Design a protein with these regions (language model features):
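Non-transmembrane, aqueous-exposed alpha-helical and coiled segments at domain scale
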Residues: 1-170, 174-328
Length: 328
């Protein structure tokens, strides 16, 4: 996952204030809207390249190549900004990491209240993106224990804001990527970092959580486990997939949150920063303990996915394009 700058709309800005950074709530709403519009109409370069690889791979089945070519054709059409990549828009998720040196201005200069909280600002941006870009409203809300109805707004969004310890002076940068991502460029400056995930970050309904004993933690048992779970994914979630596996953790919640971030490439960025002497706040999901990336098992996951024969929907070897395996 690569970070890149995006610029807030004209007239909206974040500014240095004393020893910290003040961000107007309207900025949060504006680039949340920008992020979800972008996610609805454009693929990240990495994904496009993986589709090209499938289409050009001599080992690909005819069906694999057909799917890859059609997805690339759809990407060209969607990039024009009228027809989205997929009408199954799903849950909008926002993850944010807010340094102690950052405050949000939720009222206008005249005292008019824009938003009651950062969460409301993010939610407003999500709602506007789905309404103004003719995206499908696919969120159901309960009317009773057994009955539900469409919210007709694609809200509520899932918004998780984490408090982090960064402080200092300077300005933040905004960024966007596949799931759209943001960070300050200098670890000595306060920053407000964002991760936007459309469709629940992929297909959340394919998430599987298993409580097991240590008997699973040997190569033979673990491989049998993976073969069963990967085959059970099927093709309904529109492969080629990114398959992420996280083993261990202090709680189910920690495991699943680490898993979600693994699918977005968040931990890839963390690993890269660590290698070049940078810093990242691992405590936001891993309790101060770095997830151990297991690259050899990532290769095995891709092999197992290929061996299912499911392919990119209609038979072949390209069920998965990427894999991430972490141990907590």
């Amino acid at each position: 996952m690569e970070f890149e700058k995006i610029i807030p709309a004209s007239g909206l800005a974040a500014e240095q204030c004393g020893q910290g950074l003040t961000v107007d709530g309207s900025v949060l709403a504006a680039f949340t809207e920008q992020a979800f519009k972008r996610l609805s109409f454009t693929f990240p370069q990495e994904h496009l390249e993986s589709l090209v690889d499938v289409a050009c791979d001599p080992a690909s089945s005819e069906n694999d190549r057909l799917v890859a070519v059609k997805l690339l054709e759809n990407a060209v059409i969607a990039a024009k900004g009228t027809l989205p990549l997929c009408q199954d828009t799903g849950v909008a998720q926002v993850f944010a990491w807010k340094d102690a040196g950052v405050c949000t201005a939720l009222t206008a200069a005249g005292g008019t209240v824009h938003f009651g909280s950062d969460e409301e600002a993010f939610t407003a941006g999500v709602g506007k993106a789905y309404k103004e870009n003719n995206l499908r409203f696919s969120i159901n809300i309960p009317s009773s224990l057994f009955d539900e109805k469409n919210s007709a707004t694609n809200l509520p969004a899932q918004v998780d804001i984490f408090s982090t310890n960064g402080a200092g002076t300077g300005t933040a940068e905004y960024a966007g990527s596949s799931c759209s991502n943001g960070t300050g460029s200098d670890s000595t400056e306060p920053s407000y970092r964002f991760l936007f995930c459309a469709k629940g970050g992929g297909s959340s309904n394919k998430t599987d959580f298993t409580c097991a004993t240590k008997a699973l933690l040997n190569p033979q048992s673990f491989e049998r486990f993976l073969k069963t779970k990967i085959a059970a994914l099927g093709t309904a979630a529109c492969p080629p997939y990114t398959i992420a596996v996280v083993i261990g953790g202090l709680s189910p919640e920690q495991n699943l949150q680490t898993l979600k971030l693994a699918t977005t490439g968040y931990w890839d960025a963390a690993e890269a920063l660590n290698k070049i002497g940078g810093s990242i706040r691992w405590t936001d999901t891993a309790g101060g303990v770095r997830p151990l990336r297991c690259r050899d098992w990532e290769e095995r996951v891709l092999q197992i996915a290929a061996e299912t024969g499911l392919g990119a929907q209609f038979g072949g070897s390209h069920l998965a394009a990427h894999a991430r395996v972490f141990r907590l």
